[in-house]
Amino acid sequence: MKRPMVLATTLFTTTVAGSMSLHVSAGEPASINLAGFDFTPTLKLSERYDDNFRGLNNDEKKSSWISSIHPSFILEAETRNSGYQLQYDVDNQTYHDDPSANHTDHILAFRSVLEFNSRNRLRYDLGYKRLEQTVDTADNVDNDRLTIKNAGAGYTYGSFQGLNQLDGHVDYEQRRYLNPNGVNDDRERNTTAFVGTWYHRLTGKTRALTEVRYTDFDYLQSHNPRTSIGTAALVGLSWEATARTTGTLRIGEERKDFNDSARDDRSPTWEAGIDWKPLTYSTVSLSTRKAYDEGNDDAIAIHQQKTRLGWKHEWSSRIATELNASHADLEYEGLDREDRTNVYGTSVSYAVRRWVTVKTSYQHTRNESTESTEAYTRNIYLLSFDFSL
């Protein structure tokens, strides 16, 4: 097995002159002011060892040292009633023991918020992603290559502190695959989604909510059994700073109507995210979700129930640790297959300087499946360096 290349430490010297000035906020990367625009560059260098980077059965798994160079650039501006942000990320990953897995991911996103007055706000976003994935492909030898384009817009009526608030959001996404021999072309789709939410304030810190969702999954392949309409109706609560907790809870029913099949599935659905801060420097997070996801591996849909528990503790202004564990049950609709996935992770980060953070982490994944060839274990060991201005 090849040894990893030694990560080189690059020293950056930034000259600030003329209309350029350096803006620094505690705990955040600094930005350069460029004639009214805030420009924030960051760089993440990492080296990791992945003993099963394609997520294969233990008899077939492949391991490698992986070097990553991940710069990120954010350009943003704010006025009295609006905000704009343009972000570009590029992540180059080198697999030292399998060059065929080498790839570079590109992510471009634009976001904007317009506040007409205290009761009316408009937001919209555009995005483009060109990705390669070593897992989740019908081909266990080559990467899964795809592009994702999306456009979305949302409107909020009513102030956050008011008695009632209405929020609506529409989103359109195109997903295309770039694999040779048409691998995963059956998963190409256009997705149109709408979410509408009504919030009603119960107390100063707690709001009740009612939400409806509509999603049209239009697959390009003719008579694709995954083409469907997803709908859901949910009720719940949203609260802030109540007994040191913040969170949102939604529970309801979800339905998935397939166009080319007599099968229509419905099930209880829920989403919850709760943060508990027993101390100002310690946070326990719990999230859970039960819902239908789009199918793969010949399944027309995947019914997933997942729970995650995490704990982040700041031991000092420089040192922080994280522990997390998650469990997921997956039912593959249309197949006689059920998976159970457990993931455990831990990390330690050390802020060497305000602009340099070193992090080491470990993650273990175990997937058990009624389909014996889909069972696997995976371990990832990582060392990273985060740089900013």
Sequence positions of predicted segments:
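Cleavable N-terminal export/targeting peptides
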Residues: M1-S31
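Gram-negative and organellar
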Residues: S25-L389
